[in-house]
Structures are given as C-alpha cells and as structure tokens.
Design a protein with these regions (language model features):
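Localized edge beta-strand/strand-to-loop motifs within extracellular or lumenal beta-rich domains
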Residues: 632-646
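Short, aromatic/His-centered strand-loop micro-motif at the edge of beta-sheets
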Residues: 589-635
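N-terminal catalytic cores of secreted or lumenal carbohydrate-active enzymes
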Residues: 32-181, 185, 193-201
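Aromatic/acidic polysaccharide-binding cleft in carbohydrate-active enzymes
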Residues: 270-368
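Secretory/extracellular carbohydrate-interaction modules
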Residues: 495, 503-506, 511-592
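Carbohydrate-binding surface patches
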Residues: 359-405
C-alpha cells in the first residue's frame, strides 16, 4: 500500500509539472505573439454595418429622481457631462423607461395614464430628461420601452398596451416636441409576435411609421427564441425593424443566431448590457463590452444600464453602473465616476450613422480588441482599442486603403492612473499606423477633432441631508411645472404626487395608484423615502387624510429597500386605518431572504447580501384610537429615541415598544398594500426633527428651477 501511495504521489507530481510546463509554454507563446507586430489589413470599406450608437438607460426605476432637484448650474453641468457632444461621455443614444407606476429596480416613475382615459404628459421627469439630452445633442437617438404598466392595461400584450404606447408617443410629440427614434415592445417579459404586429400596425396608422420597433429585450439563454418565429412569419419579420436582447457581454449570440438575423437584413441591438464594476475596471470593461458586442454578436446599438445615479445610497445599484453620482441636491454636490470616460472613448469619436469597418474589428492576438468606424459622408475614421486581457506590451500596425483620411490622428488614452488624457498625435505613413499598446489600457484614435476632457471647477462640497426638515407642499404653486413631484422624496413603488388638498385650501401629497400595477418587479406597500441613512434618533410626522378603507403610515429607520427585484423594506412604520386601528410595525424585508428571484445579477446580489434574517412584518404594538373616521385629517408621529419607539396620533401617545433591531435609517411615507387594492391617502406637513443622538444639520434651501413651462 505504501508503494502504491508513493507511486501515486510521484505520478501526481509529474502531472502537475507537465501542466505547469504547458501553462508556461502557452504564456510564452502569447508573449511571443504580443512582442511580434500584429497587422490589421483593411481593404474593403463597404463591409460593415451601420453604427446605431452607444449609450445608457435612464430608467429601469427612478434612476435620476434626485437629479431633478439640483440647483443650477449643477443640474445643467451633470447633463452636459453625459450628453453634450465632445465634452464628457457624449453618448449617441439614450433608452428611457416609459413610466408605468410599478417598481422597476430603483423605484417607480408615475405613468402618464394612471387609469383608462387619464392623459397627463407633464407627469414625472422623464420628458425633461429627454428634452435636455436632445437639446445638447440634436443627433441623439431617443429610444424607449416599458418595464411596468398601470392595472387598466390588463396585460402587456394587449391592444390597450399598444394604445398606451401610442398615447405616450403622441404626448412626447405634441407637448414636448420630441420624436422617438425607436420603441421596444417590452422589457424582460417574454415575447409576443402578435403584439409586435399589432403595435407596428397601430404606429403606422397613427403617424409613427418612422419610429423603429425592436423586440424583445429579454435576458438568459432563451432570449433569442423568437428569431425562428420571425423566419417563419414574414409579417412578424416586417414588424420588427431591429432584433434586440440584453447582456450579450454575458451570453453572446451564437454564430447561428447572428447569421439568421443578418439573413433577414435586421440590425442587432443590445438594449441593456451590464457592467457592475468600480473605478478603471468599470471604464475598460465598458469599452470591451462595446467592442465585443459588435465583434462577437454583431450588435450595432449597445445600451448599458444606467446613466445618472440620482438615487439615495440606500437603494440597490446606487453607485457602480452609473457615470455620475447625483444624490445630494440639497448641497449641489455630485461626482464623476471613471466609467463616464469609457463612454467617451466611443461617444467623442463617433456618431449614429457612421459605419463599422469589419476588417478593422477583431480580437487582438496579444489580448484585447479593436474597432474601426468611419464616417461614410467624409473620409474621417476612428479606432477604439482596449487591452484589458493583455499581459504585456503589444505592437500593432493598421494598414488603411484609399478612401480614408491621411490626416494625423489624435490619440486619447485611459489607464488605471489617468483617464481620457490626450497623447501625441500619430502620423500615418503611406496609409500605415504603427502603435505600441500597453496592457490594461484604452485608446481612441481619430482624424476628427474637438475632443476634450470636460470638467467643472465649481462643484459644491458634500453635506448631510438637513435636519430639521419640513415640507408643506405650498411652494409648488404650479404642480405640473415640477412634474407633480416634490423635492427629495424618492418613490420606491407607486406615485406620490402634489395635488389639491381635500377639506382645506392649498396643496398636499397623495399616493395616486390605487390598483395593482403590471409591475416588472414584485409589489409591496407603496412608499417613498427621504433623508439620511445615518439618522438614529428622530421624529417623523405627517398629517394624513384617509379615504374609506384607506390606511396610511409614516416610516423610520429604513435601512434596506431590497435587492432591486422587489423593494421590501427593513425598518419601522406607524400605520393608521380609517376606523382608528393604529399599529407600530417592524418590517424585516422579504419573507424568505434566501429566495433567488429576478435576473442573474439580481440573484447574485441576493447571494452577496448573505442575509439570514427572518423576514416579514411583525406588529410590535397595537391600539384602537377613538374619533377616527374616513375623510378627516389626522396627524401621525413616529418617534425614535434609543431603543424606545413611540407612536402618536393627533399628539397623543397611543402605541409604544422597545426594539433595538434597527438603530438608524431614513424616513418615509407609506400607502399600504391591501389584498385587492392599494390605499390612496393624502399627506401634508411632512416634518422630521432630531431627537437625542441625532444632531441638527442646518443648510440653506437652494433655488431649484421647474422642469416644465406651464403657461
């Protein structure tokens, strides 16, 4: 037995040594390839697809809800950094969410049509985002699709849904003077050939024949299953102007899928890719994503989720995907992430309508990739290179045909130390460009001019959320000018809108969604959040007006709002119903914290949280309050002082509990979810005051410009 063990050990050592030798040999081979000069020969300028743009999503939740509340000039600066040509990211396409009242990762946005017959094209802020973006770049491609829809629509593949889209397009055109470039059938909810045909027919009949229709925006291995149906159904193939799906960087198209789509003459779009990294790793991965989307999958429009993080840090994905963090409108502070310059390496060197040059689009022998784009109207061209997977310096020679400019090329470089910095120009010699490429670096070369590393010197310093804080909603004199949305409140689900107050003159807030939406994500109570995650001891209060069968609540110590696919909160709330039942409740998030739901990234986020807490909602204290009936105003106040939590109704203590389960967190307002309906209470005179350990933070209230002109 001992001899057998020794023989086995010697054999294992020999196998390991052989494997190490093979690995070293492979590494030397790769290094040898890198030290040699790789030549990229371009002779055919006609072989290559139309470039349809790179860009980002604004949506998939209320991703920029705090951006609207920024003072000037900071609000305009942030938009410049993302959308102004040859300044910052300079994206060439934007895909926005058609708001539908439901949660779609980072909260919800109010629909233009809460109920059948409702039509309000100033509700929400997404119209403002589109207008501001296209004002900066008239060539910007405007794309859109829905994540959620109001209950009255019935189902996503109905004539009502087609009509819902058409009304939104009409409002975009008639009220805001904007024309959409393309519309998606839906986001991540399967596919329906009949719906695509129905929607295309309706768009053609109602004056939107020029708006391209793409489908179907799904993820996973089955995301292209509908392509076979397109091959067998000419009407369906004719209905779709482009074929799209998500996350080609994770699951690229197969050669067969790509060939089938190209045989039908359809462009391939990626309507949502994901790069969830930090720092320079995010920047170079974005460029790699853009390059490989075309090289491998043939995608000519690549949209990443998402652009501007105008959300509270408490919310999921509040930092890593975004280009700009804009989460302190009360101070005016914002910060630019390295990822923005990944977009700039494309955005400042190309425009929608350029053409890919296929012979200049490939993986590099020494690691990395190269994309070549040209302007078919001129002789200008650009080359974008990333060397993320390279282990050493590599030499590259690009040989160009006649028909491309012979002017010197500007060179802009990004690495881990410096992002988007201009380098010495590169001269062509008889149509040859010779380059020495450093590993883990991004390069953009172009015969175009005018690129710049845009920046602003007057960014205010960061500051905590002010406390005491109050809002009586009277200063929003024309609610439509503000999109009916108050400052600093971020709706997680539902729509908390500025409306005329019942029973007394003036304005107040109301949760306006009364039915279960066709929500992209699982529903919970409708609620909105405000404040600072560091708050410990404080009081939050609001006047509430209850319709028959309504409930309303104030919330506090909110320290978690879910992983994105589902927004179950962790914290406390004080709830009152129209018959006087008052409850102090602890909410511990999703009932089964380990349940894996949502897409791949959502499931990874759930696993990363390692949350073993028992979820659900539990009543800590309950009382019956006399004198409460529907259609009256009453005051709710929730007080935190150490582990003592007290609830008041109309200034009288009615419930009390001891709990140290959650010690700090944000405040909020809630319209509870009931079995067959959602409450639609009114709220007024929101107040948050420090108690005990929480110290006052004073701040000057900044002037904010309205979103819309209403006269």
């Amino acid at each position: 037995m001992r001899h057998l063990l020794i023989s086995a050990l010697l054999m294992a050592v020999a196998v390991t040594a052989a494997a190490n030798t093979l690995a070293a040999s492979a590494e030397r081979t790769r290094s040898d390839r890198a030290s040699a000069t790789q030549t990229v020969r371009i002779s055919d300028l006609q072989a290559g697809k139309r470039f349809d743009g790179i860009g980002a999503v604004n949506g998939g939740g209320a991703t920029s809800v705090l951006l609207k509340d920024y003072p000037e000039p900071q609000r305009s600066q942030i938009m410049d950094l993302v959308y102004k040509p040859k300044f910052g990211a300079s994206v060439s396409a934007i895909l926005v969410e058609v708001p539908g009242d439901g949660n779609s990762t980072q909260g919800s946005m109010p629909s233009h049509s809460h109920y059948r017959g409702d039509a309000n094209f100033l509700r929400g802020y997404i119209w403002w985002v589109m207008r501001e973006a296209q004002q900066r770049n008239p060539l910007l491609a405007l794309d859109a699709t829905a994540w959620s829809a109001p209950a009255w629509v019935g189902n996503f593949w109905s004539q009502d849904m087609a009509d819902y889209y058409l009304a939104w397009l009409q409002g975009l055109r008639e009220v805001h003077g904007l024309e959409l470039d393309a519309l998606g059938c839906h986001n991540e909810k399967g596919w329906s050939g009949d719906f695509a045909k129905m929607l295309r027919k309706a768009m053609n009949e109602r004056g939107f024949a020029n708006v391209k229709l793409h489908g179907f925006g799904n993820w996973g291995q089955s995301k292209m299953d509908f392509v076979r149906a397109m091959q067998e159904d000419k009407e369906l193939a004719d209905a779709l102007d482009a074929v799209c799906a998500h996350t080609y960087s994770e699951i690229p198209l197969s050669a067969e899928q790509r060939a089938a789509i190209e045989a039908m003459g359809k462009p391939i779009w990626n309507s949502e890719d994901h790069v969830y990294l930090k720092g320079f790793d995010c920047l170079i991965s974005i460029v790699k994503c853009f390059n490989e989307n075309y090289i491998i999958s043939g995608a000519t429009r690549i949209i990443n989720w998402y652009d501007i993080a105008g959300v509270y840090p408490l919310e999921p994905y509040s930092c890593d995907p975004a280009m700009v963090l804009a989460r302190e409108p009360w101070s005016g502070h914002y910060s630019v992430r390295e990822s923005l310059w990944g977009y700039a390496h494309y955005g400042q060197f190309s425009t929608v309508g350029w053409q890919y040059v296929d012979q200049g689009c490939l993986k590099l022998d020494g690691g990395g990739s190269i994309i070549t784009l040209r302007n078919p109207a001129t002789d200008d061209f650009s080359i974008i290179i990333e060397t993320m997977e390279a282990n050493s310096v590599q030499n590259l020679e690009v040989r160009l045909p006649k028909g491309l400019s012979r002017q010197p090329l500007c060179v802009w470089r990004s690495n881990a130390q410096q992002q988007f910095v201009r380098q010495p120009d590169v001269n062509q010699k008889s149509g040859r460009i010779r380059l020495t490429l450093e590993p883990n670096t991004v390069y953009s070369l172009s015969t175009t001019t005018g690129q710049q590393h845009g920046t602003f010197a007057d960014i205010p310093a960061p500051a905590p959320f002010p406390i005491p804080y109050s809002d009586d909603f009277e200063h929003y004199e024309q609610p439509a000018a503000w999109g009916y949305l108050p400052h600093y409140l971020a709706d997680l689900i539902g729509a908390f809108e500025i409306v005329e107050a019942p029973k007394h003159p003036g304005l107040c807030l109301r949760q306006t969604v009364g039915d279960h939406t066709l929500s992209w994500a699982p529903e919970w109570h409708h609620y909105t959040i405000i404040g600072d995650s560091a708050w410990t001891d404080y009081e939050v209060s609001a006047d509430v007006y209850l319709n028959p069968q309504d409930e309303a609540a104030v919330m506090g110590r909110l320290c978690d709002v879910g992983s994105g696919y589902g927004i179950w909160a962790k914290g406390y709330y004080l709830k009152l119903d129209d018959q006087g039942t008052c409850k102090l409740v602890i909410t511990r998030g999703k009932l089964n914290q380990k349940e894996l739901i949502g897409d791949k990234e959502q499931q990874e986020a759930i696993l990363a949280r390692k949350d073993v807490e028992i979820g659900g909602e539990y009543t800590l204290s309950e009382a019956k309050v006399s004198g409460i009936s529907p259609l009256q105003w009453h005051n709710l106040r929730l007080r935190f002082d150490g582990d003592q939590i007290t609830g008041y109704v109309d200034g009288i203590e009615v419930v009390k509990a001891t709990s140290d389960h959650y010690s700090k967190g944000m405040a909020g307002l809630m319209a509870p979810l009931q079995e067959h309906r959602i409450s639609t209470p009114y709220f007024d005179n929101l107040k948050i005051n420090p108690v005990g350990r929480t110290k006052a933070v004073t701040a000057q209230r900044l002037t904010v410009e309205p979103l819309y002109r209403t006269n």
